[in-house]
């Protein structure tokens, strides 16, 4: 009997192979597939609300599979699976969002106002992303550089090595980030502000796994999701980036949650 399929969608700035250690704990139970790098196909540019990125994921699923899949996505990737599942529920057995909060009506309104006023960059990671260092002389140098960064301090060491290995590519100048910082910044700037309109429209089994210390989830107000969307909720100790901090524990929770959704 063939394994059930997980199609994984990565977070902004972290190509899929950064999650190799997480995948290794899932592969006994599931076939794990992914698009290696979202948002870099000129056919699907970054637009406000991530609509073309949604289309990119939907086309990938329709082209690749002849049976329903389990959509697992971290942050950006989770929101994209949510958007596709609302539009094309027949593609999915279930979706599992990893710290990918569906922001509340109040938060959405704030995002829309800030975008209209041209002030959203002041409150998003976009500016620091655009000016991030993007040139090293070796992958060891990439690893050592990010190892010193607060954002990466809690990463599992193997995960960080995978990020250095697969998140940097050799060019004529040296090693540069595989996920272009300019595109990462555009994605932050294009954060959807219309997600509340989808309440009541999700028709597939769904779960949300969150980090206990996730600032992103706190700002998004999970109370909206609890009240208006049919998600099961579970939490794992860690930040917004907990799948990269605790890959084994994350895999165990994904397996447990999917079994519950399948009852």
Where are these regions (language model features)?
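Conserved hydrolase catalytic core segment
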Residues: 68-110
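Conserved alpha/beta-hydrolase catalytic His-Asp/Glu region
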Residues: 130-186
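Conserved loop-alpha-helix segment in the C-terminal half of the alpha/beta-hydrolase fold
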Residues: 198-238
């Amino acid at each position: 009997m063939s394994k059930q399929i997980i199609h994984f969608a990565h977070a902004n700035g972290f190509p899929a192979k950064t999650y190799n250690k997480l995948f290794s704990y899932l592969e006994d139970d599931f076939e794990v597939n992914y698009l290696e790098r979202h948002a870099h196909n000129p056919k699907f540019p970054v637009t406000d609300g991530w609509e073309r990125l949604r289309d990119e994921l939907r086309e990938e699923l329709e082209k690749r599979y002849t049976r329903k899949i389990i959509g697992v996505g971290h942050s950006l990737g989770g929101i994209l699976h949510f958007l596709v599942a609302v539009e094309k529920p027949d593609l999915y057995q279930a979706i599992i969002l990893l710290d990918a909060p569906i922001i509340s009506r109040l938060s959405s309104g704030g995002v829309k106002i800030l975008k209209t006023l041209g002030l959203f960059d002041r409150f998003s990671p976009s500016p620091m992303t655009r000016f991030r260092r993007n040139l090293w002389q070796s992958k060891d140098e990439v690893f050592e550089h990010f190892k010193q960064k607060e954002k990466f301090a809690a990463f599992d060491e193997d995960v960080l090595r995978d990020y250095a290995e697969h998140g940097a590519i050799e060019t004529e100048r040296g090693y540069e980030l595989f996920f272009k910082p300019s595109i990462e910044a555009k994605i932050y700037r294009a954060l959807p502000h219309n997600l509340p309109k989808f309440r009541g429209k999700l028709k597939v089994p769904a779960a949300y796994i969150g980090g206990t210390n996730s600032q992103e989830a706190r700002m998004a107000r999970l109370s909206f999701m609890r009240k208006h969307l049919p998600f099961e909720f579970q939490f794992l100790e860690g930040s917004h980036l907990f799948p990269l901090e605790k890959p084994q524990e994350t895999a165990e929770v994904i397996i447990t949650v999917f079994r519950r959704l399948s009852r």
